[in-house]
Amino acid sequence: MKKPFFIIFFIFCSYYNAQANEWKIKNKWKISCGLVDKEALVINGKPKKSFNKNEFKVENVIFKLDSGEVGKCKSDKKPTGGYKYSGRQEITHRLPTGKTIFESTILTSGAPQYRSHFFQIHDGRWSGKPPSMVSVQKDWRVRNQHSNDCFKPKCKQLTYDIFLKPGEKKKFKAEIQYDQKEKSISAKYFLDNKFIIQHLDVPLAKKNADGPYGPNKPYIKIGIYRIGDTGTTTFSYDDIILKNKKE
């Protein structure tokens, strides 16, 4: 009688492990902080005209900010980086545990800015830099930023000759590992399949952190978060894929 039981148990365990190792699509986004205006956020071809905390699916999204527009997060009205305010329009997605891959084709257009973050892994900390960020500078050169808890060689940029210039579509990819037990994240970034940035074993904030998904719950942010604007700018994300598997 024991042999059939062990066979069934083995089959069940094999099936469970196979299911756990499969990639699963994640697609539950939310607006971050609020809407700047009725043209600032276009989801799947339809403008978001009112703000709420409901989740929605995203295949493509366009973020647009005009000159002088201030973001809706409380900190956006405060001076930072030598500028009087921050412009912001973003959406967020909870970061699952295990391995997560984000992919999208990004297209920028319009006026440059002093700096604009277009991808972040945040932990809801109230001050200081979040664990991982990718931005463009005033010449549209892609640069990395990260929390002050990570240093070279774990956190570094591998090449500086990379751009997101207006009118040039680029394939962006982030490979993320969220270790819930160690309370850390690792991320590797690629542009047109070129490995450009790594942030490894970056610790999450231990206190004073409360984001849209609860205390110390990391999440992804995409969109425009800029200072030093010089005019209207758009960031378009097409063919968005966010997938995860437990490990």
Annotate the PLM regions.
Residues 29-70:
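Extracellular glycan-recognition surfaces and repeat-rich motifs
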Residues 23-28, 96-99, 205-247:
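Ligand-recognition surfaces built from glycine- and aromatic
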Residues 58-144:
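Secretory/extracellular carbohydrate-interaction modules
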Residues 146-173:
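Short, aromatic/His-centered strand-loop micro-motif at the edge of beta-sheets
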Residues 171-204:
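Carbohydrate-binding surfaces in secreted/extracellular proteins
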Residues 99-107, 171-179, 236, 241-243:
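Residues within well-ordered beta-strands of beta-sheet-rich folds
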Residues 4-13:
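Sec-dependent N-terminal signal peptides
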Residues 18-20:
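Boundary at the C-terminal end of the N-terminal hydrophobic targeting segment
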